[in-house]
Amino acid sequence: MSLQYQTGFGNACATEALPGALPAGRNSPQICPYGLYAEQLSGTAFTAPRAENRRSWLYRIRPGVQHLPFAPFAGAQRWLSDFGRQPVTPNQLRWSPLPMPDAPTDFIDGMHTWGGNGGPEEQSGVGIHLYAANRSMQGRFFYNADGEMLIVPQQGRLRLATELGLIDIEPYEIAVVPRGVRLRVELLDDVARGYMLENFGTAMRLPELGPIGSNCLANARDFQIPVAWYEDVEGDFELIAKFTGGFWRAPIAHSPLNVVAWHGTHAPYKYDLRNFNTVGSISYDHPDPSIFTVLTSPSDTPGTANMDFAIFPPRILAMENTFRPPWFHRNIASEFMGLIHGVYDAKAEGFAPGGASLHNCMSGHGPDADTFEKASHADTSQAHYIRDTMAFMFETRRVIRPTAQALASPQRQDDYYQCWQGLQKHFDPEQA
């Protein structure tokens, strides 16, 4: 089925699956249309500034409070929120893609935490995860009280059946599910693999554009929000909650995806990365990678993000007398990269779609030896067309602490450092 969407990042939306289900003129009437319950879902404090306030009013068949008590849940064993306090290696790290599971595995049980920082109780930091699944969630629903979830598919399409409507995403698209929104993740293909970032901090937003002006990068009009959809289903289900880093399970006798109408600003959304309006230099030098930012979560320090989500999409390089690939770099921020499709222009070999790399604070990184040699002798009088690629980066202000399971993973490339060992010494004090 072809899904319908509303458009516009951060818009105050209003949608109903049955005519007249949205109360007119008030949020909480004495009796709601169709015998529905009114429930507010708050994503920010009541007193948050209006421009940053996130809340939605839901009109649902049964209220969200109706379920049996929670008890600890034994699943999701590889989805972690405790990133430890042990010293972190400064070595550059890289991993090959996760293999697809052999046993039946859904989105929740197929999540593998690769690293993170901060935590849900601090309301700051991130969790970074890879997922690999081969079946839809069956008889279970999930919500994350710890943070919003940024889902980046690399292989296989997903349907996110949420309280506020349906979202379909495929590779090259992303979705963000706000804190607390209940959902069921369905596979639209036989298998699915990708990346997921948990943002424990301030909700993601579009970056400020500064001198770029009022257009470019990710344009607000291209973000899509679901329309109201509901299912009125009863049965023996389980509601799984992620709360303060732990997982909990509550029996529930009906589907919680029973919101017939809603209005507000706290809602899931999707975005097609192919719509990103890339900017760059048309004279010389490679600008800072902040020009590729899609979404950002601000911190309490102006100009310094809790986390940024940036992409490296197809683009045209026109800079003359310039080393065009991303330059060698040591950064106060920490960078986790993934590859959705193709080849990343700074790494000719070893970085495969579905793989990942981690370059932490002040750990050197940059193009491998082969890329450096080719770019150093390229004809920069001609434009270079980078096609058939899509890489991305999760950048955080804090050090990303890799988990023990990531460090011990058979997908870890222990020889990653070798890609720079072939860089030659070209220094000649007699020749400028």
From Swiss-Prot:
CDD domains (alphabetical): cupin_HGO_N
The UniProt record lists the keyword Iron: yes
EC number assigned by the record: 1.13.11.5
Name this protein carries in UniProt: Homogentisate 1,2-dioxygenase
Job description of the protein: Involved in the catabolism of homogentisate (2,5-dihydroxyphenylacetate or 2,5-OH-PhAc), a central intermediate in the degradation of phenylalanine and tyrosine. Catalyzes the oxidative ring cleavage of the aromatic ring of homogentisate to yield maleylacetoacetate.
Lineage of the species this protein comes from: Bacteria, Pseudomonadati, Pseudomonadota, Betaproteobacteria, Burkholderiales
Assembly information from the UniProt record: Hexamer; dimer of trimers.
Pathway: Amino-acid degradation; L-phenylalanine degradation; acetoacetate and fumarate from L-phenylalanine: step 4/6
NCBIfam families: hmgA (TIGR01015)
GO cellular component: cytoplasm
Source organism per UniProt: Bordetella parapertussis (strain 12822 / ATCC BAA-587 / NCTC 13253)
